[in-house]
Amino acid sequence: MSRLNILLIGLGNMGKIHKRVIESNNNTNLVGVVDSSFKKKLELKKGVKYYNNLNSVDFDNELIDGVIVASTTKSHYKIGKKILDLNIPVLIEKPVSINSREINLLLSQAKRKNTVFRAGLIEIYNPIFEYIKELKLK
């Protein structure tokens, strides 16, 4: 099985978690990172492309199997819409958008395009939630 080529948008706290997971998974390959901070480029392994904005990514010539959006919440809708327009599966970190209307528009677009659209709910796997569940059961 070939590895999935992932583009990561945003290299803040959550983006760094996604980056670590992508790089440690034998089934995924981090092909590029989009972040406006040039300092973040220094954190990338050799061979991982750096883009300072989404418009710099050559989607026509890059092999991108999926995109993870971990940028600022206010940018999620615009980025998600562009990625879905390209028929590329996308995971958008929570909160997906600043309002439910934009989320519904993204959901509708994903259905029309028959493309995967998911919310990143990684924190539900945080061990603290298991601990809280145990407390509630006592």
Regions found by a protein language model. Name each.
Residues L7-I9, L91, R118:
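Conserved hydrophobic packing residues within short motifs/helices of P-loop NTPase cores
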Residues I22-E23, V57, K136:
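Hydrophobic C-terminal alpha-helix "anchor/cap" residues
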Residues T28, D65, I88, T115-V116:
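Short, well-ordered coil/turn segments that N-cap beta-strands
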Residues S97-K138:
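A contiguous active-site-proximal alpha/beta segment in oxidoreductase catalytic domains
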